[in-house]
Amino acid sequence: MLLLLLSIIVLHVAVLVLLFVSTIVSQWIVGNGHATDLWQNCSTSSSGNVHHCFSSSPNEWLQSVQATMILSIIFSILSLFLFFCQLFTLTKGGRFYITGIFQILAGLCVMSAAAIYTVRHPEWHLNSDYSYGFAYILAWVAFPLALLSGVIYVILRKRE
């Protein structure tokens, strides 16, 4: 049981790290000396030095991506907190439904954010020299891991 709890906590922390990195790092779209993320656009030289960064445009779709990524982090943190609370207060044989629901919501939020970004980002559709960066890919990797973690929480029963 201890090994199972430890592996679930490691999976949950891995999801949290993926969510934080994908939200913070400026690598959602890269190409031609530019790097774009949810918060700013940066241009770099061939040596890798950052020359100029400016805030991303205030598009409604970008604000919805920002909001859903932040919500996914909040839901995942709440889920981890609720897991520890339920671990000590839940009766024997009880299931971690609330924890699982919050983690599944975190997964759905990150999936929504990545899907909206995929469909709506204008530079990607206009220029084939751009490609998705690693932070964008980490967001997509966090989606199935968060769903898996949430399903494990829902199935998990508390033992002594």
Curated annotation (Swiss-Prot):
Q: How does the record say this protein sits in the membrane?
A: Multi-pass membrane protein
Any one of the GO BP annotations:
chemical synaptic transmission
Keyword Transmembrane helix tagged: yes
Question: Any transmembrane segments, and where?
Answer: 2-31, 65-91, 96-119, 134-156
Q: Does the keyword Amino-acid biosynthesis apply?
A: no
Write out the annotated subcellular location: Cell membrane
- So which residues have sugars stuck on them? 41
Q: Topology: which residues are Cytoplasmic?
A: 1, 92-95, 157-160
Extracellular membrane side: 32-64, 120-133
Tree of life domain: Eukaryota
The disorder this protein is implicated in is: Charcot-Marie-Tooth disease, demyelinating, type 1A: A dominant demyelinating form of Charcot-Marie-Tooth disease, a disorder of the peripheral nervous system, characterized by progressive weakness and atrophy, initially of the peroneal muscles and later of the distal muscles of the arms. Charcot-Marie-Tooth disease is classified in two main groups on the basis of electrophysiologic properties and histopathology: primary peripheral demyelinating neuropathies (designated CMT1 when they are dominantly inherited) and primary peripheral axonal neuropathies (CMT2). Dejerine-Sottas syndrome: A severe degenerating neuropathy of the demyelinating Charcot-Marie-Tooth disease category, with onset by age 2 years. Characterized by motor and sensory neuropathy with very slow nerve conduction velocities, increased cerebrospinal fluid protein concentrations, hypertrophic nerve changes, delayed age of walking as well as areflexia. There are both autosomal dominant and autosomal recessive forms of Dejerine-Sottas syndrome.
Query: Can you tell me which family this protein belongs to?
Result: Belongs to the PMP-22/EMP/MP20 family.
* Protein's job: Might be involved in growth regulation, and in myelinization in the peripheral nervous system.
Q: What is this protein called in UniProt?
A: Peripheral myelin protein 22
Q: Per the UniProt entry, what species is this protein from, by scientific name?
A: Homo sapiens (Human)
